Amino acid sequence: MEPSYDHEHPHHLLTNYNSKKYPHVSRTPEYSHSTGSDYPEHGGYLTDGRLMHESNSDAGIYHVRQGSEHSSPSLHSPAIQSSGYENEHLNEAVLAAHSHSHSPMPMVSSAYVGGGTASGSLINSNIPLLGGGGNSVLNKFLSHPHAGMVGGGTGQMEDCTSHSPIEAASMWSYDYKGDLCAPNCGYLERHKPLPADLKYRPGGTQSKSAKESRIRRPMNAFMVWAKIERKKLADENPDLHNADLSKMLGKKWRSLTPQDRRPYVEEAERLRVIHMTEHPNYKYRPRRRKQSKLRAMQPGGKEQSESSPNPGTGGSKSNPKLATPPLATASSSYTTPTDESTCNSTNQNHGQSTPGGLYEQPLKPTYSPSSVDCYSNADSTEQIESLAANCPPALLNESSPTGGGYDNSLLLKKLTKPSPSRAAKSRQEKLAKSEEKNKGSQSQGQSQQGIYAATYPLAPTSVAVVAARGMYVTCNNRGLLDHGHSVKGTFYPPVSVSEDDNSTSMRNSISALQQHCNVVTSTPSSSGGTMPTSEMSSYTVSMADNCGNLRLSMNELSGNEYLPSANAYGMQYEDFLRYQSNDMDYSTSAVEHKETTSDSASGQKCLKYPDTNQNYDDYEAEAYSNAMLPATAASYYTQLPYPPTSLAAFPLQLAVPFQQTTSGAYGAQPIQSGYLHYGNYGGYEGMAQSQPQNQAPVHHQQASHSAPPSLSVPPNQTVTSNSAAISMQQHHHHHFGPAPGMVGVGVGVGVGVGVGEMLFEQQQRKDDEISNILAGVRKTCYSN
């Protein structure tokens, strides 16, 4: 291999471009411009130092890894184990050269190992990256024996060496990674062993594009420190699992004094500044763990099993990420991508044992670009939680690699509760659709599941709502914490208990709702049936009963693409329910009556949602209540604080009501309850409880439901009619809580507030509304 002078090569161009673009990167001219003469001995290296072997295949594999592992590939670029690569050139040369070419970090000067095949030396372009600290880093970096080789024949090497003497030590053996980007080091370390290489090879190509495009966050001080310390700990305790190392590192870091941490803090700041200069428009987007991990890790499934003895919790526990701070979670994968990612994918697989489980997860974009933007600010934990919310419990567990810093079990608990992923839900809902007839009895059990799912994560959950036409609307439900007061209940998507169960229970609950709606007085009996299932279910039932039509919405939900009735934003959910309910056979209401059990299921669904929404602004609740007081949905709409047209304008939470415009507008649907809102959402657990008790007197139930802040409706409002008052109370409740199927809680039989009716609005309206909803959702997602 003659050193070719292809400075013209894209790679070389890249390096030149980098040097121009990032003058701060101090590449030694020898590196980028060294002529073949510099490397004549290294046939493998191009004059620019780029490895001749740098071929697409090589680069592809390498890139994939590189992109995945570290925010600044350049850091890790210095050396990639040649053994892993088929290319003989690769073997000959340190891979660093090509890394910078694809690496997001232009900073990486093309550091080309100058040595012969043996030269594993990393002369590393990272030196500039490291900046002032670079010298020491270089020293460490170059201290590898191979590094010495690098220096051997090339003047360029001397530049690097000038920073520090090059010692013969295998680059790999050295834990320069502490100095270099942690992710890079972790990456190198992981891939250093052949198995790791093998692991990545299969998955590498799959996730290559994703990983390549991914810009890693700059390491924080802990990561910078942990990079170095982890290597030391690993050498001292070779038998320890990465998760244990992470725990030890976390404790050790916490025990460090500010003085001890200062150098790492400074280095982290320096890296951050560099990162900012390189990626001025960089915006942190939490990794779509489920998707990418699933894809990337599946090939390495064997590793997954290894890394996570217990797929659900083991993965998260063991994730070395634990050691790394949440910030590291995105990049921490570098430390144990195998553990965590494999765990994640494994968990996902396990968690989503449901028919579509595996393929479904990737399908449902946990975070659509917009959703990512929505919570790009969320810290890793939040993102993980949101993922968890969307993912099956197992997934959640894996998702919580961040758990390393945090109590994984805690995260898992939080996240696992809404285990059903949206995709799973949609899939299950479809199944439920088919099974729904058979599931009348199941619905109770399902409702129980709903209970487990009921814990509504405070953490943001991104919800992919399948709008009509199979569109995915992804809104990330930011946790209450995230949204704060601004979107109290809207973003909590009603979480259906389980996919199939959810849909089935939804339908059942809907039917139950219809029963109640049709026979408000029958509510007591209905509630009696539901109560056994659970307070939640009874609560839901009463709600559902109140809005018999609601049952339709629920059915629609379960039956329709509407993916996660539970996951959708409350209002989105409502809207979708409404639309789907239109699709549903309205006549089903009679059937719904039969399905008392389903009532309980819906109740559970409602319960799922904690009554986080109770805090919904009272004024809004009152407004809704007042709107509800009017017998007709139309009046409700007119009274809505936000005109129906302003759907897009007001947050999703409110969006539903306007969509419920006049029943007259829908014409086809009675739209008893102007708002399909999730009147008695699970948010009101108290309501759920009281409802069962009060179900006989619907108004009592409703009142109890309204007991939550949404209860703000004045007595005179209740006067309108028990059902009306109840419905309005529930309605405003629903604002607060995203009860999945509960939307039609408003009993408003006389009042005509029946949510179900609204749901029944004609499909055409549904379609129109959906577009509006989508617009509103998008607005909300992006704005948030």
UniProtKB/Swiss-Prot annotation:
Transmembrane segments: none annotated. The gene is Sox15. This is Putative transcription factor SOX-15. It comes from the Eukaryota. Residues 426-439 have a biased composition (Basic and acidic residues). One of its GO terms (biological process) is chaeta development. It is found in: Nucleus. Residues 306-321, 329-355, 367-376, 688-719 have a biased composition (Polar residues). One of its GO terms (molecular function) is DNA-binding transcription activator activity, RNA polymerase II-specific. Keywords: DNA-binding, Nucleus, Transcription, Transcription regulation. Residues 215-283 bind DNA. PANTHER family: SOX TRANSCRIPTION FACTOR, TRANSCRIPTION FACTOR SOX-15-RELATED. It comes from Drosophila melanogaster. Residues 282-293 have a biased composition (Basic residues). Residues 278-376, 407-448, 686-719 are annotated as: Disordered. Residues 409-421 have a biased composition (Low complexity). One of its GO terms (cellular component) is nucleus.
